[in-house]
């Protein structure tokens, strides 16, 4: 009941707050401008994370008081609230005026240090994974900081298409929340389900056609932080002898729950390293960008990646009785293989082309954007963005008549050049005739 009420209150509050944010952002013209890497073509309100955060915090504090949390849990609640406030304002500033990477890193470091040193929330053991057991205190603190910052930024990186960050956030938080519910950890139940309620309300607008809103860094960094916090609490509660429900493969299950953002981050970092670029350079090599290039819409890509995430969690849970290192090997082998098959399946590519053609027929603006509607009325096109040579982006046209488009466009250019030359020549002749008559 507590989980349901906390989630419901956060949902209702966020549903009330977000329309006010949309109105304010439009009036103040604080819109997200489409750029080379953008998967959207129109100005869109951002700062959706502010509405989610406000609803989450109010729900968390209110039910924390109602439940009557003990002093240690109240300290955890207040430290968690303080650290997320820092991240939210950091995200707002980055949404409005882009922050330098070092300033964002410093803010993330401070937020992480608050919960580690005030509440001693840290990873204390690998539970035998890779032959590592209990960690020394300093190693434990440093590794926990690394995990927090990794998950925050990994989650920030997947916030590239409509619904994706929110959907993965709900799946991950629900996975942790069910574990906390079985163990009657009421503070963490509130954290998990209040976050689910706030994200669910945001998705109503993020997936809307007329009242669209982006969460921005103010949302993605806070969600990533809260998921990292839940993940570490999950590991520590699973290790404690007082747990009512335990899982003997905690670290592997945690990796599976966060597999999509972590795998996507690792993938783009490897690609950038191969191209001798900074791992923090922005590009369009993310998994969700690849699905858009295949022809899937934002919603279709989000649904596909969400299904894969659920399958990864289910796989890790089913393998729980195996030796932990064998589990790790199996999970790290099968999950990337699923994504590889997703990109290279001929059937998926064919279906993507069909879906792309149907959608392009319904949306004639794609043809207008590329400037071929007047000259190539039968052409079915859709504009997406892809990185070329790791540095520049170009519009990629998917459709049945690519050659026809290229030939006709070249022909049209030549015709225009010829007509322009004829016009210049005729003007010169007329000018010459006039001058001869005057003489």
Located regions from the model:
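Function-critical hydrophobic alpha-helical transmembrane segments in multi-pass membrane proteins
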Residues: 144-155, 164-165
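Juxtamembrane helix-capping/reentrant segments at transmembrane boundaries
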Residues: 33-47
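Alpha-helical transmembrane segments
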Residues: 1-29, 53-89, 165-294, 298-373, ...
């Amino acid at each position: 009941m507590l989980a349901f009420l906390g989630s419901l209150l956060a949902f209702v509050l966020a549903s009330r707050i977000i329309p006010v944010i949309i109105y304010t952002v439009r009036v103040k013209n604080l819109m997200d401008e489409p750029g080379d890497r953008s998967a959207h073509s129109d100005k869109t309100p951002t700062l959706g994370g502010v509405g989610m955060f406000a609803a989450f915090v109010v729900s968390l504090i209110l039910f924390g008081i109602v439940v009557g949390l003990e002093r240690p849990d109240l300290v955890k609640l207040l430290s968690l609230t303080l650290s997320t406030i820092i991240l939210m304002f950091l995200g707002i500033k980055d949404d409005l005026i882009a922050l330098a990477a070092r300033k964002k890193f410093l803010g993330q470091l401070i937020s992480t240090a608050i919960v580690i040193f005030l509440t001693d929330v840290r990873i204390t053991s690998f539970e035998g994974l890779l032959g590592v057991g209990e960690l020394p205190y300093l190693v434990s603190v440093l590794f926990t900081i690394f995990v927090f910052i990794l998950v925050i930024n990994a989650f920030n990186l997947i916030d590239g298409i409509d619904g994706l960050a929110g959907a993965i956030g709900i799946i991950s938080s629900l996975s942790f929340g069910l574990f906390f519910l079985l163990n009657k950890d009421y503070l963490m139940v509130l954290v998990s389900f209040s976050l689910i309620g706030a994200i669910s309300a945001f998705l109503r607008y993020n997936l809307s056609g007329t009242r669209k809103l982006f969460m921005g860094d103010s949302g993605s960094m806070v969600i990533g932080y809260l998921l990292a916090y839940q993940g570490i609490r999950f590991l520590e509660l699973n290790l404690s002898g007082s747990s009512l429900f335990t899982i003997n493969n905690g670290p592997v299950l945690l990796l599976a729950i966060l597999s999509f953002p972590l795998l996507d981050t690792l993938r783009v970092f490897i690609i950038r390293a191969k191209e001798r670029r900074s791992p923090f350079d922005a590009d369009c090599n993310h998994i969700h960008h690849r699905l858009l290039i295949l022809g899937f819409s934002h919603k279709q890509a989000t649904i596909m990646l969400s299904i894969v995430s659920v399958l990864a969690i289910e796989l890790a849970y089913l393998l729980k009785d195996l030796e932990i290192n064998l589990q790790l090997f199996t999970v790290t082998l099968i999950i990337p293989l699923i994504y590889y098959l997703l990109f290279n399946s001929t059937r998926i590519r064919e279906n993507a082309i069909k879906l792309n053609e149907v959608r392009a027929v319904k949306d004639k603006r794609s043809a207008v954007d590329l400037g071929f509607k007047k000259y190539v009325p039968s052409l079915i096109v859709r504009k997406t963005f892809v990185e070329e040579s790791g540095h520049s982006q170009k519009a990629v046209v998917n459709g049945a008549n690519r050659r026809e488009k290229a030939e006709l466009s070249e022909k049209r250019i030549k015709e225009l050049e010829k007509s322009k030359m004829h016009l210049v020549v005729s003007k010169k002749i007329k000018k010459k005739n006039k001058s001869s008559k005057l003489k």
